[in-house]
Amino acid sequence: MTIILKPGSVPLETLEKIYREGLPVRIDPAFHAGIEKAAARIAEIAAGDAPVYGINTGFGKLASIRIAAGDVATLQRNLILSHCCGVGEPLSENIVRLIMALKLVSLGRGASGVRLEVITLIEAMLEKGVIPMIPEKGSVGASGDLAPLAHMTAAMIGEGEAFYRGERLSGAKALGKAGLKPVVLAAKEGLALINGTQTSTALALAGLFRAHRAVRTALITGALSTDAAMGSDAPFHEEIHQLRGHKGQIDAGRALRTLLEGSAIRRSHLEGDQRVQDPYCIRCQPRVDGACLDILRQAARTLEIEANAVTDNPLVLSDGRAVSGGNFHAEPVAFAADQIALAVCEIGAISQRRIALLVDPSLSFGLPAFLTRKPGLNSGLMIAEVTSAALMSENKQMAHPASVDSTPTSANQEDHVSMACHGARRLLQMTANLNAIIGIEALTGALGVELRKPLTTSAELAKVIAALRAKVVTLEEDRYMADDLKAAAELVADGTLSGVISAGILPDLEA
């Protein structure tokens, strides 16, 4: 299946499908005429006498140096090679595929001036599985993601490295094995390919998609913990949330209320319970998870706009002029990444407190210490809770905003930068930590509910426990725990736990 992209209106749902499924993409042929028109205009400018940045001049601080017409192709090639300065481990294939798809969307708007053959090469590389090796570090998020995108482009011109069928090869060899030929870049094409926010945006989108799946699963594990602790569902009453009015809180409260519907555990303590109120980690879940959902939705709107944006420089305007601007500055992406980081941090923080509540017999309303029937002889989930605390603390440190930092670069020509790329990249580690925290809560919540037998939980939560137990059997005696934690985290990450819940209960990104 090939996804057909309509530049300017590609929805988040399609972007997530590209990220998760690695499907090939193509630009809608209806956009080809606009692409070719802009390319023809760039060719005219390159043949003329007027200096235009990046077409017949140097780059950055060297923009005042005029380049002879005969050196334009060399200029573009040198640009790519000199900017391949990335360091660190290669970005994953699914991230690079999304970067390439986003670059197609941007170029497909017909304002960048690249020829159609550049577009078709990217499409063919995605179809045949030639994935450029892009090091993870080296971008400050303005002037675009220069180093990462230079590594992408290097493979296109037969330089650098690329992955093909599991092998890491030279760019030329990877293209050759796939039956493709490298492109010789024309005027502005190198600049159009490396100038842009596609790396930062792809990383931020990956963080967004992972965080959204995590918050949906955190609502499930939060409901499990509520039932395991014999907590009240009264704070999830619809009218309470309507009186405050925040959409995320309303949606989170509705989800929790529905997930707990029909629980025999809840019915068992509707009367005679001397506790007046539950701790905040139980009672305030809709307020915290709902606030996180709201800022994820805000970030989603920003990133959907950016994914469809033209962010290179200069741009070919509708009147045919090539005008220098600054759409490559990734400040919107940096802000969105910081928002996502805050949400990821707080989802994990309140989840961790529920884990701590369930393993503490002074708080868990009758559950045995560390959820083991033989405390002392067995330690149960004691250290699983400690691990969740370590991960929570690490995420708090990583949640410091990246966008508040800036440093002058390129001889002060690029004197304010966004730091969007590493601000977005940290989301991969943060969401991995979050998945592990929520996975641990799934283990504690499920075991806590099982220890309430013969009382039973709701039908929805019973499906979640069954999905968990298909991979992780109930803890009766101490055993090697690392495999349990890994399996539980994977069930969060791959959507297994959220996938068993009936449609319409868990909130979507698009409110």
UniProtKB/Swiss-Prot annotation:
Main location as per UniProt: cytoplasm
Keyword terms, alphabetized: Cytoplasm, Histidine metabolism, Lyase
Classification via Gene3D superfamilies: Fumarase/aspartase (Central domain), Fumarase/aspartase (N-terminal domain)
Entry keyword Cytoplasm: yes
Positions carrying 2,3-didehydroalanine (Ser): S143
HAMAP family: His_ammonia_lyase (MF_00229)
Protein name: Histidine ammonia-lyase
Primary gene name: hutH
